[in-house]
Amino acid sequence: MIFSSEDAMNYKMMGKFLSQILIVEAGFMVPALLISLYTGSRAAVYGFGLSIFITAGVGALMYYFCRNSTRRFFAREGMVCVAGSWIAISFFGCLPFVFSREIPNFVDALFEIVSGFTTTGSSILGDVEALSPGIMYWRSFSHWLGGMGVLVFLLALSPNGERGKWYTMHLLRAESPGPNVNKLVPKMRTTARILYVIYMVLTFINFLFLLLGKMPVFDAVCTAFGTAGTGGFGIRNDS
């Protein structure tokens, strides 16, 4: 049996998609690095600096080698992109924990970040307050990012136009059990962006109320992330 090029998986398109996710994730680590620099936590600075370098570097290399991909993007590519995105953000997201030696065991670090991105709220930490501010921020932020779901985040990033329509449709098919999502595509992409704006506004309101309750700014930020994400990651041992 002879297979045409249309039958093959579009690996370059999938690689390009995942590379963009990694570059965005590296950008999300920058605030945690700045917090670590400000608080003088050398181990955390090293952990985030190395993690950003590796994550952005891998993403940049993938983008370079996959930059000339065709636009062919079907349901099978969508499934791989959704599954691959979960694996990639979890693997690279746990690196700051490991490199800073604050959660030195890779399996424990992976469990902690997956718990954050999935808003499970379970933790292997016996003493949360021992974490440096930068690591604590990253842990809480993973909760906030996962609160709206990785799929919604991917939809919010998808491009406009006909190409974006194909991205959105097949990403939705990868996670939605319904038989037909084609009619939802234009609205879903716009809705995803609107939802993130609402989510950020609600998080900010949450933050303001915590400040009114005399909570320190940093604690209010981390707590707002944890509560908005509904997973319940706390920053105190007795929370």
Enumerate the language-model features and the residues they cover.
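Membrane-proximal intracellular helices of multi-pass ion channels
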Residues: 1-239
